[in-house]
Every structure is written in structure tokens, then in C-alpha cells.
């Protein structure tokens, strides 16, 4: 019997790729939600998307054998919530948030391989003294603690770059506020509690070979 594999935001291109992998004939790949609504970067309606996903899954008459995704926020954070709800294997929400929250992920990386992690620090972009509180020299990156597709990431080469970047961050950082509702669902470590989507992280430049989790 074929397994029913729900894929959040599945499009035709990726469906063709999935159908070419080994043992694909043993799976029914089922589209869960429209990809264009999920990647609408003007507004991440996470709670609405979860409600629609639950509605579609509840109406399905067959077995739900797997729920996966292949894109960034909000899909990446929807997967663990839906997997837990429907009792299928998947990552925990905490493990995903550790990777998605840029400051938390840097703390985890620093604990595991401190010799390879450059300096970093969180800061409030609405603090007029933020630049003076960053404890390392130029150049460095600043970015929201939650972003996707490299949005709102700025390379700060000198003092004059900082105000320009901060102005844009202050205007647009609210885009990722839905991320805070996910942080409220778990017990955050003391070092991370309070560092929500309104915060940024500054970090020194890192160089080297870059590989994805998939090996690319």
C-alpha cells in the first residue's frame, strides 16, 4: 500500500523531482497548501496557514503517513507542529527553533565548535546607542534574529553604513513578528528569553566552504 506523504507548498517542479527518486512509486505525494501564499513575504500569516493545513488534513480520508516541507520560514516551522499533531515522525519544534533563531543557533554553534565561530552579539535596532554596544570592529553583518531568504541582512563596512541599515530594519523588522508566537510555545533558555523577532544579531564576517544540510 502506498504511503501518503503530504508536502507543504509542493509545486510541479519539485513534484517531478520527487517522482524521480528511488521508491517514489511507493508514495502518494500530496500538495498541502499553495506555495505562493506560503512565500508571500508581504505578510507571513502563520496561524492562518496552520488552520488551513489542519482543515485539509482533517478532510483527508486516507492515512497520513508523513508531513514534510522543503522551503524556509514559515514552512520549516509548520512541519514540527503538524507532525506532532498527527503523530508522524518529524523534528521537535524546539530543535527547529534552535536553528531558525539566529542568536540561539549561534550560541549552540559556539558551544559545539567554539574555535570556528566568530564573535556575535544581539542588539535592539531601536536602541540609538546600539552601535556603541557592539564589541567588535568593522566589517560585520547585522540581521534580524529571524529572517528568510537573506532578507534585511546588511554588511556594515564602516560607521556610516549602520544608520542606513538601521532605518530599513526599523521599518520592516515587524514582518517576522509571527515567529514570536512559536517562541511562546516552548521553554526558552535564559540566554535567549526576551530576544524576540524585534531584535537583531551582529556578527563578524565568516569565510570558508559553505554547505547545506543536504550536502550542496
How does the language model describe each region?
Residues 11-12, 146-148, 206-209:
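Glycine-rich beta-alpha junction loops
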Residues 73, 144, 213-215:
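Generic detector of well-ordered alpha-helical packing
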Residues 42-44, 49-61, 76, 80, ...:
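N-terminal beta-alpha lobe that positions the nucleotide/phosphoryl donor
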Residues 29-31, 120, 153:
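Conserved beta-strand scaffold positions in the cores of enzyme catalytic domains, especially
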Residues 8, 143, 203:
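Short beta-strand segments
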Amino acid at each position: 500500500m502506498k504511503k501518503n506523504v503530504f508536502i507543504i507548498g509542493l509545486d510541479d517542479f519539485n513534484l517531478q523531482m520527487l517522482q524521480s527518486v528511488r521508491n517514489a512509486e511507493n508514495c502518494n505525494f500530496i500538495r498541502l497548501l499553495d506555495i505562493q501564499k506560503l512565500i508571500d513575504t508581504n505578510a507571513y500569516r502563520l496561524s492562518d496557514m496552520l488552520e488551513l493545513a489542519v482543515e485539509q488534513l482533517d478532510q483527508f480520508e486516507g492515512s497520513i503517513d508523513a508531513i514534510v516541507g522543503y522551503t524556509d520560514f514559515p514552512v520549516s516551522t509548520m512541519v514540527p507542529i503538524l507532525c506532532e499533531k498527527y503523530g508522524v515522525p518529524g523534528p521537535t519544534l524546539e530543535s527547529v527553533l534552535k536553528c531558525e533563531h539566529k542568536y540561539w543557533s549561534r550560541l549552540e554553534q559556539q558551544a559545539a565548535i567554539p574555535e570556528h565561530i566568530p564573535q556575535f552579539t544581539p542588539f535592539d535596532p531601536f536602541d540609538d546607542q546600539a552601535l556603541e554596544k557592539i564589541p567588535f570592529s568593522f566589517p560585520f553583518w547585522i540581521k534580524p534574529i529571524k529572517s528568510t531568504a537573506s532578507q534585511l541582512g546588511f554588511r556594515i563596512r564602516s560607521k556610516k553604513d549602520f544608520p542606513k541599515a538601521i532605518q530599513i530594519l526599523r521599518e520592516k523588522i515587524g514582518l517576522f513578528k509571527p515567529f514570536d508566537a512559536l517562541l511562546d510555545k516552548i521553554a526558552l533558555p535564559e540566554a535567549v528569553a526576551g530576544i524576540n523577532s524585534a531584535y537583531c544579531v551582529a556578527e563578524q564576517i565568516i569565510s570558508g566552504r559553505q554547505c547545506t544540510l543536504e550536502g550542496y
